[in-house]
Structure formats: structure tokens, C-alpha cells
């Protein structure tokens, strides 16, 4: 026996609603899982100790780093002088 209250478009609409609901829930769940995994407070076994395969460069003192000299001095830009 067929249900007289069910027309042919109603099951399709119900399937569409359920499908959209599942897509939204699954997309949110995957994002939450990735964020928890990426920003967890506990360090994972892989990240606990850093062992470089190649030797790292020596640390440079602050006095050894010289700032680059500016080619244009401050205040000599004609676009900034026009007001």
C-alpha cells in the first residue's frame, strides 16, 4: 500500500536536506580535527627533539648585522612633500 500523503517530490527533498546536513557536519568535523591536531598544547613525538640532518649556521652577534643604507634619505621624497 502506498501512502497517499507522500507525493513524489517529498522524498527527494528529504534526501537533499539530509545530504546537505551531512556535508556541513562532516566539513566542520574535519576542520575541528585539523585545528586540534595542528594547535595541540602537547608536543607530539615527532616535534619533541630537533635533530638537523645538516649542521646549522653559527649564531651571529647583534653587532655584526649592519642595517642597509638608504638610497633616498627621509624627507627627500617629492611625493611626500606635496600636501
UniProtKB/Swiss-Prot annotation:
Signal peptide (residue range): 1-29
GO biological process assignments: cell-cell signaling involved in cell fate commitment; maintenance of root meristem identity; phloem development; regulation of cell differentiation
Key word Repressor present: no
Keywords: Developmental protein, Differentiation, Secreted, Signal
UniProt GO MF annotations: receptor serine/threonine kinase binding
GO cellular component, one term: apoplast
Keyword Secreted included in the entry's annotation: yes
Protein known as: CLAVATA3/ESR (CLE)-related protein 20
Biological source species: Arabidopsis thaliana
Family of the protein in this entry: Belongs to the CLV3/ESR signal peptide family.
Amino acid at each position: 500500500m502506498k501512502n497517499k500523503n507522500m507525493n513524489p517530490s517529498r522524498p527527494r527533498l528529504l534526501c537533499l536536506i539530509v545530504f546537505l546536513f551531512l556535508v556541513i557536519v562532516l566539513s566542520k568535523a574535519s576542520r575541528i580535527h585539523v585545528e586540534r591536531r595542528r594547535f595541540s598544547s602537547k608536543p607530539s613525538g615527532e616535534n619533541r627533539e630537533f635533530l638537523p640532518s645538516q649542521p646549522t649556521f653559527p649564531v651571529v652577534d647583534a653587532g655584526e648585522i649592519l642595517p642597509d643604507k638608504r638610497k633616498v634619505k627621509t624627507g627627500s621624497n617629492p611625493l611626500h612633500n606635496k600636501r
